[in-house]
Amino acid sequence: MSLEASFPRLRETGYRITSPATNEYNCIAWAAGESDRWWWPDPSGISYWPEGAPRQETLEAFLVAFSTVGFELCSSEVPEGGVEKVAIYVNAQGEPTHMARQLSSGEWTSKLGKSEDIEHQFDSLDGSQVYGSVAYILKRSL
């Protein structure tokens, strides 16, 4: 399935592919600023997950994991100087499915599973069948 078929709003809002496909890292690692390992709270411990964060596919576990690298809850996706923001997406059951990171330009960057990284508008992936909706915005000082 094509990128635009999976995320119909990308066609409307525009996007740019910024890297080749790779399975070296996923969207969670990319949101944390890493591109050398896969982040996921799998119970078996195969993927990296921050020490002290529950190995559960829950919003709470993701909030704890990102607090270990300096993120805290934020009320807005509006860019702020000296601040990096990430968005956590959830499906209809409230389970985390995706994360995106805000760039200094105000655009957002996402790693699409084992596919490419893209730059996109904040709401371009929101409401898709694939990732669901943004549940939380987090921020940390740069």
Predicted regions and their residues:
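Cysteine-nucleophile protease catalytic domains, especially the papain-like/related folds used
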Residues: 12-65
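Short amphipathic alpha-helical surface micro-motifs
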Residues: 10-14, 68-70, 115-120
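...with weaker cross-activation on analogous glycine-rich loops/strands in unrelated enzymes
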Residues: 53-115
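Aromatic- and glycine-rich peptidoglycan recognition patches
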Residues: 102-142
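Ribonuclease/tRNase effector modules and their secretory precursors
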Residues: 1-9, 15-16
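Domain-length accessory/inserted modules outside core catalytic folds
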Residues: 21, 37, 45-48, 59, ...
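Generic structural motif recognizing short loop/turn segments at the entrances and edges of beta-strands
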Residues: 11-13, 26, 82-86, 105-106, ...
